[in-house]
Structure formats: structure tokens, C-alpha cells
């Protein structure tokens, strides 16, 4: 594959609202973003947190409805994609070769950070999928190094996607329905500038440098998939902003990025 991606999985209510810009972007994925059909997909999920990197090793992916108090139709959705056990084993091998731990989960399916965006991106559900967890107790550098260890997968036709939320405050954060909250814009702009300028060490150390990161990412698990995708693109990749929109509440940001290796061989 030509690069890695960091996407926003969005709110499950997007299933009922066709006008949402993020949904329209995801629906145009195969036509406008990744034309080539990947052999398999490795998706790093903000909604699977573990102590050490863990991959699901399954033949068929169950659909996990890991959200509460949503309309009944959302709980009827089934994304019946095949699993990618061979990819899971390769992820385990690459991480352990890099001196990291990796565990295998033989039961877990796909949570909504995985199946929900993929339902719009690849509605055919015919591409093998492997899910990788994040470690909220770790930092950006750890997740970048996880991605770096996985960069050889790009040469094997694997589409690597980090799925989270670029600005993802807690649910009780005051909304800004008449626009976008200034603190959210400031964080989003800082992240864009750091990525497009190649200041990847700053991105890895966002807790020391990014304005308003505490409110933008109180748990950080929704940003760490970005670090994995960034690391997986190899040394000094080129970053491109490929989508930007905001939730109607003015506090959840959906900026989406592509990380392209600067050489044919990643490292």
C-alpha cells in the first residue's frame, strides 16, 4: 500500500444521518482515497484498550455493539467481514522481533471504532480484517514505536488504519452548537501544523506541547491510533490532511490524515 491512514470513526448516529460530511467522506473512500483493493486491513481501535498490544485472531469477525442508549436499528447492524488470522500472526511476530510484547485474542470481534467506519468504506465486507488494541497507560512514543515495528506490512498489501477521534473530549464537555469551540480549534490547528511540518517528535510528545490537550483528549486512547499509523509509514513520511469536519455539537473534530512513506522501503 502507498501509505497509512488515521480516520475518525464518528458517532454511531451517523448511520441514521446521510448528510453528515464525515459519512460522505468515508462513503467515497474507494473512489477518492484508496483505489487499490487491499489484501487485508489492520485497524488500530481506540475502543480496545489493553495493557499490552493485542490482536484478534479469528476466522470471522463478530460485530460488537459497544455503545449504550442508541436507537434500536444500530444494534441490528452486522458487519460480517472475514478475519485475518495470518495477519494477526504476522503482527505478533513483528512486534516481538522489535522487543515488544504482543498477545493474541481468539474471541474478540470488531468494535464500533472498526466496523462502523469500515461499513461505509468497504460495505462489501469482503476484505480480511485484523484489529489491534491501544494502551492508554502508555504514551505517544510507545504507540509510534508499535507502528514503526509494523511498517513492513505496507509492502505486503496491508492497509493500516488508525481509527479514533482527532478532537475527542469527554461526553459531559459543554457543547458549542453555534460554531466550533475555540479550544478545539486551537488543538486541531496545532496538530495539523505539527504533522504537516514534519514535527513528529512534537506529536509524540503532545502532552508537553499541545494546547488544550487535556480537554481535547482526557483519555488519549482516541489519539493513539494516529501515532501507530504515523509510525507505520516509516521514517519521515509525508503527511496530508484529507478531510476535516466537525460534529454538530462543535467539540468533536474529525480531521483525517494520510501518511505516505518518503521512500519505497519503509523502516
Swiss-Prot record:
Descriptive protein name: 4,5-DOPA dioxygenase extradiol
Pfam families xref list: LigB (PF02900)
Location within or outside the cell: Cytoplasm
Organism per entry: Mirabilis jalapa (Garden four-o'clock)
Family of this protein: Belongs to the DODA-type extradiol aromatic ring-opening dioxygenase family.
EC numbers: 1.13.11.29
UniProt catalytic activity: L-dopa + O2 = 4-(L-alanin-3-yl)-2-hydroxy-cis,cis-muconate 6-semialdehyde + H(+)
Keyword flag Iron: yes
UniProt cofactor note: Binds 1 zinc ion per subunit.
Function: Opens the cyclic ring of dihydroxy-phenylalanine (DOPA) between carbons 4 and 5, thus producing an unstable seco-DOPA that rearranges nonenzymatically to betalamic acid. Produces mainly (S)-betalamic acid. Required for the coloration of flowers.
InterPro entries per record: Extradiol_dOase_DODA, Xdiol_dOase_suB
GO BP, one annotated term: pigment biosynthetic process
Tissues with expression: Expressed in petals. Not detected in leaves, stems and roots.
Needed co-factor(s): Zn(2+); Fe(2+)
More details: Requires ascorbic acid for iron to be in the proper redox state. For the same enzyme from B.vulgaris (AC Q70FG7), presence of Fe(2+) is not necessary to detect activity.
Protein keywords: Cytoplasm, Dioxygenase, Iron, Metal-binding, Oxidoreductase, Zinc
Record GO terms (molecular function): ferrous iron binding; stizolobate synthase activity; zinc ion binding
Keyword hit for Disulfide bond: no
Lineage, opening ranks: Eukaryota, Viridiplantae, Streptophyta, Embryophyta, Tracheophyta
Amino acid at each position: 500500500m502507498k501509505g497509512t491512514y488515521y480516520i475518525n470513526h464518528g458517532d454511531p448516529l451517523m448511520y441514521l444521518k446521510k448528510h453528515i460530511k464525515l459519512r460522505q467522506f468515508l462513503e467515497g473512500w474507494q473512489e477518492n482515497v484508496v483505489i487499490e483493493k487491499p489484501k487485508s486491513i489492520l485497524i488500530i481501535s481506540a475502543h480496545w484498550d489493553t495493557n499490552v498490544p493485542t490482536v484478534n485472531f479469528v476466522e470471522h469477525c463478530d460485530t460488537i455493539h459497544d455503545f449504550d442508549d442508541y436507537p434500536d436499528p444500530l444494534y441490528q447492524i452486522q458487519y460480517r467481514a472475514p478475519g485475518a488470522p495470518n495477519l494477526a500472526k504476522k503482527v505478533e511476530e513483528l512486534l516481538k522481533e522489535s522487543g515488544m510484547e504482543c498477545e493474541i485474542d481468539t474471541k474478540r470481534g470488531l468494535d464500533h471504532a472498526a466496523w462502523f467506519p469500515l461499513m461505509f468504506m468497504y460495505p462489501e465486507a469482503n476484505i480480511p480484517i485484523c484489529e489491534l488494541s491501544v494502551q492508554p497507560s502508555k504514551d505517544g512514543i510507545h504507540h509510534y514505536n508499535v507502528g514503526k515495528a509494523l511498517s513492513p506490512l505496507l509492502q505486503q498489501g496491508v492497509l493500516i488504519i488508525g481509527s479514533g477521534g482527532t478532537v475527542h473530549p469527554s461526553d459531559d464537555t459543554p457543547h458549542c452548537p453555534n460554531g466550533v469551540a475555540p479550544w478545539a480549534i486551537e488543538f486541531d490547528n496545532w496538530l495539523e501544523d505539527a504533522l504537516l511540518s514534519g514535527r513528529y517528535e512534537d506529536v509524540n510528545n503532545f502532552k508537553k506541547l499541545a494546547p488544550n490537550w487535556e480537554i481535547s483528549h482526557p483519555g488519549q486512547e482516541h489519539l493513539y491510533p494516529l501515532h501507530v499509523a504515523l509510525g507505520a509509514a516509516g521514517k519521515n513520511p509525508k503527511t496530508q490532511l484529507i478531510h476535516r469536519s466537525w460534529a454538530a455539537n462543535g467539540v468533536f473534530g474529525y480531521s483525517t490524515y494520510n501518511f505516505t512513506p518518503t521512500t519505497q522501503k519503509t523502516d
